[in-house]
């Protein structure tokens, strides 16, 4: 397969052809938690609270899978750009193997710590019980998630975005169909409640992996997974973790943030914990759409970086940034105009609806500013500059927002937590802008 179109095709058509399937994929993929939440909300408010408390753990699993997958994706694309197919094959093989090991370890550790983790945020035994029921099943599918996302990043690295889109859509459709059947016991299906939501998600994710395997066997791609390369090589492992660890931390930081904010909000009322949980369900539509553009950008940028096309790398960044700003602008308008309508998808509690609308009004003020941070972090990952990418995310999710939320909650009240979001986005955007001109901008000029 000829990969030279990555550096020859006009940037906008190339970016859209790579990114649009990923935008659709990420939009559909975000439905996993959204659909679970919509149906779980019909069980009880306690069930919705349990789901909100388990969300950081789900996000952590996904973060490790995707973060290390970013390393797989970037290294493969760089080797393909440099014409080193054998090294690309080694990266794919050893990257997949390592991510499967990650999944096994996560399952074991997760099952051990979940009771203590949930007890940190609530004394309600009903909520803890539901959280354990849901998280136990979710954790059992960790290895499948790791393998599935590894294949996703391998297919993306060779530019095969359509298969990724179809695989993710298949898993989501299976999840949507099974959710009501397993939660409420429709027909001959057992009534499993919140456990049914977790099982439906796991089966959906398994369907995605099965489709990847079928396509890989029947329609071979440019990169091969070979048993001869299963023996880990220090150089290959170092390359993968050099990008994968910062990328994983980038994606895991939101889990840490949600847990920290849950602790602050729980001191006021469980209502605010639910509001935060619903907000993160809603914002996945917005940020995963933007992330779809970035996933389309990443292999193109990595390939051109490997091919020494530095001026083209800079143009790819700017084009992606303009599109993401547009996405964030639309999200800002929607959240400002119809916040209660959005919240009502997940709850009919009047207090939750009112407080949720206030939260969305305040938080959406930082959406457009976040474009700088989001695109810059993705670009740095594509160029193998994991430390810079991690610095942006660390500022955005820890250094600014958590202290600001704590201080403002004490001085302004609970609404101060929501103001901490846009404050963090603006400060981080300024720093990301400076890093861009120091590194990517300078590289493009040279």
Give names to the regions the model predicted:
Residues 1-19, 76-143, 189-245, 301-366, ...:
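Short alpha-helical transmembrane segments in multi-pass integral membrane proteins
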Residues 60-63, 107, 175-180, 209-213, ...:
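Hydrophobic transmembrane alpha-helices of multi-pass small-molecule transporters
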Residues 69, 138-156, 164-172, 197-210, ...:
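Short runs within selected transmembrane alpha-helices of multi-pass transporters and secretion channels
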Residues 110, 153, 179, 183, ...:
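Structural signal for membrane-spanning alpha-helices in multi-pass inner-membrane proteins
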């Amino acid at each position: 397969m000829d990969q030279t179109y990555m550096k020859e095709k006009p940037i906008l058509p190339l970016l859209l052809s790579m990114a649009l399937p990923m935008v659709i994929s990420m939009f559909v993929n975000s439905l996993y938690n959204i659909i679970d939440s919509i149906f779980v909300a019909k069980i009880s408010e306690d069930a919705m609270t349990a789901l909100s408390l388990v969300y950081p753990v789900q996000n952590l699993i996904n973060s490790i899978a995707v973060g290390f997958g970013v390393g797989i994706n970037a290294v493969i694309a760089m080797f393909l750009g440099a014409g080193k197919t054998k090294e690309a094959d080694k990266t794919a093989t050893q990257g997949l193997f390592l991510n499967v090991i990650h999944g096994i370890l996560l399952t074991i550790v997760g099952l051990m710590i979940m009771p203590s983790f949930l007890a940190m945020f609530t004394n309600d035994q009903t909520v803890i019980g539901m959280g354990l029921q849901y998280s136990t099943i979710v954790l059992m599918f960790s290895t499948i998630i790791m393998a599935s996302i590894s294949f996703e990043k391998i297919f993306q690295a060779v530019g095969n975005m359509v298969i990724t889109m179809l695989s993710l859509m298949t898993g989501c459709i299976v999840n949507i169909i099974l959710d009501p059947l397993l939660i409420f016991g429709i027909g001959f299906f057992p009534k499993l409640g919140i456990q049914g939501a977790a099982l439906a998600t796991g089966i959906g994710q398994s369907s995605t992996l099965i489709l990847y395997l079928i396509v890989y066997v029947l329609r071979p791609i440019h990169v091969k997974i070979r048993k001869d390369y299963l023996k880990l090589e220090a150089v290959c492992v170092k390359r993968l973790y050099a990008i994968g660890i910062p990328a994983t931390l980038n994606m895991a930081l939101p889990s840490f943030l949600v847990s920290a904010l849950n602790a602050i909000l729980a001191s006021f009322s469980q209502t605010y914990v639910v509001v935060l949980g619903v907000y993160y369900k809603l914002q996945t539509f917005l940020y995963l759409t933007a992330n779809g553009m970035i996933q389309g950008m990443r292999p193109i940028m990595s390939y051109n970086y490997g091919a020494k096309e530095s001026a083209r790398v800079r143009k790819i960044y700017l084009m992606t940034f303009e599109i993401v700003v547009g996405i964030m602008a639309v999200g800002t308008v929607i959240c400002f105009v119809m916040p209660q309508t959005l919240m009502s998808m997940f709850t009919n509690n009047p207090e939750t609806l009112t407080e949720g609308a206030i939260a969305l009004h305040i938080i959406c003020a930082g959406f457009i500013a976040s474009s700088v941070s989001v695109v810059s972090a993705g670009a740095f990952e594509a160029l193998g500059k994991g430390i810079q990418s991690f610095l942006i995310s660390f500022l955005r999710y820890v250094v600014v927002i958590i202290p600001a939320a704590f201080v403002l909650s004490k001085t302004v009240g609970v609404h101060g937590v929501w103001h901490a979001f846009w404050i963090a986005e603006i400060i981080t955007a300024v720093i990301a802008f400076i890093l861009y001109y120091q590194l990517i901008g300078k590289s493009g000029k040279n």
